[in-house]
UniProtKB/Swiss-Prot annotation:
Localization in the cell: Cytoplasm
Organism: Aeromonas hydrophila subsp. hydrophila (strain ATCC 7966 / DSM 30187 / BCRC 13018 / CCUG 14551 / JCM 1027 / KCTC 2358 / NCIMB 9240 / NCTC 8049)
Cofactor binding: number and manner: Binds 1 Mg(2+) ion per subunit. May bind a second metal ion at a regulatory site, or after substrate binding.
Main location per the UniProt record: cytoplasm
One GO term (biological process): DNA replication, removal of RNA primer
Protein name as catalogued: Ribonuclease H
């Protein structure tokens, strides 16, 4: 029987592009874990993706995950758009390269390990875990020791 995990994620970018961060809150029974990281130059969409990737990557074994995000980009991308992108060799319907392909491929690999239910919540609407993720992401984006987002392409 797979462990049931609630994973909440959010990304933030100050400037877009600019300094950015991700935040994730994981809940398993009475256990709670928070994750955050910041990057010098990135975008909000990259940080939304990174939050989901890092949250899933933290799980040491396959789990049943209920992942809640305020990003329609992430939720629709991973549940709908990615199917066509993969069939077409990672190009869009208009034959343009998929943006953030490095992170979409990383998320796809993490998703394959788990059973995931993707949920959307309106951002900044008072949802406690989403608000906490937003706080973690903004704090990370404002940090002094920001990593380089090597996959970011202007």
């Amino acid at each position: 029987m797979l462990k049931k995990i609630d994973l909440y994620t959010d990304g933030s970018c100050l400037g877009n592009p600019g300094p950015g961060g991700y935040g994730a809150v994981m809940v398993y029974g009475k256990h709670r874990k928070e994750l955050a990281g910041g990057f010098r130059l990135t975008t909000n969409n990259r940080m939304e993706l990174m939050a989901a990737i890092m949250g899933l990557r933290t799980l040491n074994e396959p789990c049943q995950v209920r992942l809640t995000t305020d990003s329609q980009y992430v939720r629709q991308g991973i549940t709908q758009w990615i199917i066509g992108w993969k069939k077409k060799g990672w190009v869009t319907a208009s034959r343009q390269p998929v943006k953030n392909v490095d992170l979409w491929q990383a998320l796809d690999a993490e998703v394959a390990r788990h059973q995931i239910e993707w949920l959307w919540v309106k951002g900044h609407s008072g949802h406690p875990e989403n608000e906490r993720c937003d706080e973690l992401a903004r704090e990370a984006a404002s940090g002094k020791q920001l990593a380089e987002d090597t996959g970011y392409q202007p």
